[in-house]
Amino acid sequence: MILASALQAQDTVRYTGTTLSNIDYHHGQLSPAVGTHNIQTMRANRADTGATSWTYNHAPMLAYWNNTFYLEYLSDPVGEHIPPGQTLLQTSKDGYNWSNPVVIFPPYKVPDGFVKPGKKDTAKNAYAVMHQRMGFYTSKSKRLFALAFYGIVLGQKDDPNDGNGIGRVIREINADGSFGPIYFLRYNHSFNEKNTLSLIHI
């Protein structure tokens, strides 16, 4: 005798309201939520010479650990898929006053001669772009780690998230504000410890 039971998909969060956003506007033309505040943590300026000189800054990710807010975001000189890319970090004790940005994952050189499967564009003096969707991890032992992803864009219509990037990286953020070394956590299929450069310990 065979017994079969009907499987049901897990119920997921879904929006049941009638108000829709207008995607032609960065704020969606939605009313602000009562009690929320918009805090500018840095101002980009191409005339600067430091970490704020690159004007494409996005994908902010926020963590709260050890009585401190940590804000990680990725940065490019002018556009999302225009190398080089880097990831920066800011900290705050109150959420209003923020430290100057520091580079936590620096620009990374793509090996010369690299070609993506099925493509013709070849890397020559090229740098990776950052393209992570997860910025922090807190371990069971209460340690904080920053994560990032080095993707590759070799042409105008290339995609850094096509599975042909270099790989995911990780480094520890210590309680005193210092950083541990950068390690590759996971390589994509074309890369390994033999054909990747050691990352700078900054």
Question: What is each of the regions a protein language model found here?
Answer:
Residues 1-10:
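Bacterial Sec-dependent N-terminal signal peptides
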Residues 17-45, 72-106:
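Beta-propeller domains
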Residues 68-72, 142-146:
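Entry beta-strands of beta-propeller and related beta-repeat scaffolds
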Residues 76-80, 151-156:
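Short glycine/acidic-enriched loop and turn motifs that connect beta-strands
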Residues 78-144:
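Blade-loop segments of beta-propeller domains
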Residues 86-94, 160-176:
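Beta-propeller blade signature
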Residues 99-106, 180-190:
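Beta-propeller fold detector
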Residues 200-202:
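Conserved small/polar residues in nucleotide/adenosyl-binding loops
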